[in-house]
Amino acid sequence: MKRNASGAQAVQIYRVGGSVRDELLGRAGSDRDWVVVGATPEMLIASGYRPVGRDFPVFLHPETHEEYALARTERKHGTGYRGFEFFASPEVTLLQDLERRDLTINAMARAEDGVLIDPFGGAADLRAGVLRHVSPAFAEDPLRVLRVARFAARFAFDVAPATESLLRTLVASGELATIAPERVWRELATGLMEPHPSRMLSVLRECGALVLWLPEVAALYGVPQRIRDHPEIDTGVHLSRALDYAAAKAFALPVRYGVLAHDLGKGATPRRAWPNHSGHEAQSVRLAERMSARLKVPQDCRDAGRLVARWHGVVHAVRALRPAAILDLLSAADALRRPERLDTLLEACECDALSLPGRGGDYAPARYLRDALAAAKGVDAAAVARKAKASAKPSGAADAIAKAVRAARLKALREWRKSNPGLGAKPGTPPPASRPRRRASGA
């Protein structure tokens, strides 16, 4: 599009939003977004831009395919994050467009000549590490509670006191209930994948939103654990450390969701039992399932939440297990068919164990279980099945095959343990309190 005068007003194009912010932070990778001031949709279409905006005029550049939006204002006319109407015209100024944005760090623009336009002090807030709202209209959009928490998780910035007050106002308004569960999950998932996911939980907790969206997680804060197992004592603090460990290791989203879910049952322990949490795994599974269903969590994360909640304690003590119990654990994780599920479980357990103060190094149970899986997979299950089928009655063939394959894998595990005596529990190490229950698959 030609950037010249149109009528009485010149058409001006500005780079805006995240790419300007990240440029000032010395970060690369943000998509570039543009605002066009002084133009009409017809002018952009005539210049080859393709309209893609459903609610307001947004166009794709004919060559770069970057998004160009007409400068616009917005007005609240209903409830929820969708209750807005937008107004775009050649008369809308850049200042008006920037004023509708959420945070000062996102309300900067770069002119075509390179000049930074920063009417709300975004650059200063970047230097200070502060998330600050642009205007009181910030409190009109409940989705901004999640956005602020997500930016806190990305940059580890503090929330300005006045902005935190507006977050509480949004929570008190009841409008958070208007956000669809799928959208809540999408924002939470993005926050979990940021470098400092604990900051997201902290911001949501401080403004009162955590108990609304993640009540199972909110219940963990202030719940004590045995100091010999958890020097940080507070279960919520431990969760925060484990999530940040997962981020530092760049673990995938299902792993991080498994970490989020692993100790949920401790929030349901009666106060009279503190700091002990006997049987919390079963409660954790129940609460993880409830949380996953409410947020409509995708299946891979839902499976991880259930798996880690149920088995993390057993994995930590795996070197004290007998071969039969090890095989039960591998079967519960469906590791023989889907080894990536075992990887998810082990990585989440690593976060649980090595995020503790003073811990570090390798997570020994992971190497142990992967070696055990290799030993079990070394069995030629097809050959064992053929032999069992040949000697079994037709009506009982399936059961005979299952028993024969299990027996062969148990033999392989016993031989593996016998040939690697140093892998087992040290003398005097007690067995885990409960033996894993046999399950065909899943957890």
What feature does the model see in each segment?
Residues 1-443:
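Catalytic cores of the polymerase beta-like nucleotidyltransferase superfamily
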